[in-house]
């Protein structure tokens, strides 16, 4: 009897990549009956799904590939593939530098992966396809297969904002939205498998625009309204959004649709209008704060998290202090902050940068300390409250406890029976720790 082939997938970066990796697995399971393995040494196929947002992304990929080279020498039939945004950037140069790589594919061509693997096996020639065939990939993917009550659902690809620091438009292409009815179909398929919470994904997810079957123009607000009508779907999230796409209709969803969670990740990047202009964000601090005010009017308990870039070229101490002020004024929940690192080929990479690495690190530490204090204060304010929690798994810290997620995206650990996994329960919060909560079933 032939044993099923095994696949090892290493995923870097964002939730879009996590979604794409799950769809790669769906395809190869459908095509070849593959099973996953956590051990690359026993794999028949090794895939790296890469991210190019952070510094030295390419070198990290080649470092991992170098570890797999001896496995290829030992087993010439092993298939090694590189996908994702680094694949889009590097293309043929990946094979030139690492000739043992068999397939290179971009985010928009992952649906061709089974055919590319078959072509490599048949011809012995490495296959490279990093084209941008819009949403063709969604037409060729099998129905999703999920385990657990929470799932990702990709609704659009790419970004057309062209912020000066960002490589995404060059690696994932311009914005392309999936057909409205296709998204509803996938959501229903997920619900039929027991999914209760969906997270809608896109690089600029609230820029979603498509048409319904009757020709009505649909945006993210309308999509959320329709998804909320699926009885089994009890909770809806979306990420990542752009402030300029927070339309009145979308903000109004927070007042009308309880299934839409009381948490929003809304990247601001900086608190200085001058820096925002140089980043080509196309909004001001005042406009951003106005959006937050409207969101809190619609949903008073909403938690707002964000992204911040520290040390952008030309950032002065005054600019940075403006970012600190914005952090305090908005009261951001736990957020992501990074020192600026130039992405090759982006406009910002050509800007003069006279801020020392030491000063950038100092600014980052100050910003993160403030944000940490604010996040902890929000957690502390939840002690004594009763939260609706979707139980996801056994706790990573204690085998006799469960772990779940609140509406506002907090992890809660509490004693409970494993039979409750994938269910919603009410939990009284008893303690706020550094980045998690403790509680008890009500």
Swiss-Prot record:
CDD domains: Radical_SAM. [4Fe-4S] cluster 1 binds at residues 14, 51, 85. Disulfide bonds: none annotated. GO terms for cellular component: cytosol. Its cofactor is [4Fe-4S] cluster. Binds 2 [4Fe-4S] clusters. One cluster is coordinated with 3 cysteines and an exchangeable S-adenosyl-L-methionine. The keyword Membrane does not apply. It catalyses: N(6)-dimethylallyladenosine(37) in tRNA + (sulfur carrier)-SH + AH2 + 2 S-adenosyl-L-methionine = 2-methylsulfanyl-N(6)-dimethylallyladenosine(37) in tRNA + (sulfur carrier)-H + 5'-deoxyadenosine + L-methionine + A + S-adenosyl-L-homocysteine + 2 H(+). It is found in: Cytoplasm. Signal peptide: none annotated. Keywords: 4Fe-4S, Cytoplasm, Iron, Iron-sulfur, Metal-binding, S-adenosyl-L-methionine, Transferase, tRNA processing. InterPro entries: Elp3/MiaA/NifB-like_rSAM, Methylthiotransferase, Methylthiotransferase_CS, Methylthiotransferase_N, Methylthiotransferase_N_sf, MiaB_methiolase, rSAM, rSAM_horseshoe. The keyword Iron applies. Residues 380-442 form the TRAM domain. Its main location: cytoplasm. Residues 145-377 form the Radical SAM core domain. Catalyzes the methylthiolation of N6-(dimethylallyl)adenosine (i(6)A), leading to the formation of 2-methylthio-N6-(dimethylallyl)adenosine (ms(2)i(6)A) at position 37 in tRNAs that read codons beginning with uridine. Monomer. Belongs to the methylthiotransferase family. MiaB subfamily. This is tRNA-2-methylthio-N(6)-dimethylallyladenosine synthase. It comes from Methylobacillus flagellatus (strain ATCC 51484 / DSM 6875 / VKM B-1610 / KT).
């Amino acid at each position: 009897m032939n044993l099923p082939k095994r696949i090892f997938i290493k995923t870097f970066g964002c939730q879009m990549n996590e979604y794409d990796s799950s769809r790669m697995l769906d395809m190869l399971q459908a095509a070849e009956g593959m099973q996953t393995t956590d051990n690359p040494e026993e794999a028949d196929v090794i895939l790296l799904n890469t991210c190019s947002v952070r510094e030295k992304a390419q070198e990290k990929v080649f470092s991992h590939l170098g570890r797999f080279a001896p496995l290829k020498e030992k087993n010439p039939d092993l298939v090694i593939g590189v996908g994702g945004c680094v694949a889009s950037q590097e293309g043929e140069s990946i094979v030139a530098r690492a000739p043992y790589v068999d397939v290179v594919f971009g985010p928009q061509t992952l649906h061709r992966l089974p055919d590319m693997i078959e072509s490599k096996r048949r011809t012995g020639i490495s296959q490279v396809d990093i084209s941008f065939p819009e949403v063709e990939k969604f037409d060729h993917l099998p129905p999703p297969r999920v385990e657990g009550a929470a799932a990702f659902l990709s609704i659009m690809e790419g970004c057309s904002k062209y912020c000066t620091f960002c490589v995404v438009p060059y690696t994932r292409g311009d914005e392309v939205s999936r057909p409205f009815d296709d998204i509803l179909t996938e959501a229903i398929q997920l619900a039929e498998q027991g999914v209760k919470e969906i997270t809608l994904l896109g690089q600029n997810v609230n820029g979603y625009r498509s048409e319904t079957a009757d020709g009505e123009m649909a945006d993210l607000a309308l999509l959320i309204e329709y998804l909320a009508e699926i009885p089994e779907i009890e909770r809806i999230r979306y990420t990542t959004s752009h402030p300029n796409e927070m339309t009145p209709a979308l903000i109004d969803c927070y007042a009308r649709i309880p299934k839409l969670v009381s948490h929003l990740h809304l990247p601001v990047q900086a608190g200085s209008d001058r820096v925002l202009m140089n980043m080509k964000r196309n909004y001001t601090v005042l406009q951003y704060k106005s959006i937050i005010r409207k969101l809190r009017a619609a949903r008073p308990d909403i938690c707002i998290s964000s992204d911040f870039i520290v040390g952008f070229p030309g950032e002065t101490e005054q600019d940075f202090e403006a970012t600190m002020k914005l952090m305090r004024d908005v009261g951001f929940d736990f957020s992501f902050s990074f020192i600026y690192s130039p992405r090759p080929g982006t406009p910002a990479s050509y800007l003069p940068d006279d801020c020392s690495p030491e000063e950038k690190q100092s600014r980052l530490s100050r910003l993160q300390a403030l944000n940490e204090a604010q996040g902890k204060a929000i957690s502390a304010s939840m002690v004594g409250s009763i939260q609706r929690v979707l139980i996801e798994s056994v706790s990573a810290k204690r085998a006799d406890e469960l772990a779940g997620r609140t509406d506002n995206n907090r992890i809660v650990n509490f004693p409970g029976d494993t039979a409750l996994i994938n269910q919603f329960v009410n939990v009284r919060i008893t303690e706020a720790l550094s980045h998690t909560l403790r509680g008890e079933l009500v």
